[in-house]
Amino acid sequence: MVPASEEQKKDPAFVNGRNYLAKFNYEQNVFFIQEDGYFYDWSALNPIAFFGNSRSSTFVDFDDDGDLDVVVTNYSSKAKVFKNLQQSENNWVRFRLEGTRSNRNAIGAVAQLQFGDQQRFGTVVSGSGFLSQKQYELHFGLGAAEKVDSVTVQWPSGIKQKLTDIAPNKLHRIIEEVPVAETK
């Protein structure tokens, strides 16, 4: 799931492939959720829709502009990288967690964001599919929210850490047991 336009909702993105070397390629499917709660199949209109024998996708902000770019791994061909060129006035926030008592990459840490009456959760994972690895960062779309009231991190070590008044549109480095986040 990816916040395609830094809104608060997440839109699903799918890749297709088989667990054997296919003799043909598959269409990549892209769906966006509409206001009425139904998904719209945007595959034919989407510039990242291509035929391939793909295995997984991952989302990362390669150019540090605040929006997520897409990497699709393929079974028998090179990975494809798609830069997000969408313009948006919506806000976002990223966190890079660093464990001291927990593992250094904070894999398994859960962050809970509170902004206004909204709440979001994210878990640090190392990968989500065959031939992919994620950046060890959490990215949250905030919509029009101008600040994050708090972020609470539940570390794998069992430590719970809360930071407040987090500025949007920045990458914040949170070190386990250090009471202040570094901002980039």
Predicted regions and their residues:
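Carboxylate-rich, polar loop motifs that coordinate divalent cations or form catalytic acidic clusters
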Residues: F31
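Short, conserved, GDST-rich strand-edge loop motifs in beta-rich repeat architectures
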Residues: M1-F24
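Gly/Ser/Thr/Pro-enriched helix-cap/hinge segments flanking short amphipathic alpha-helices
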Residues: F24-E27, E35-S54, D64-K184
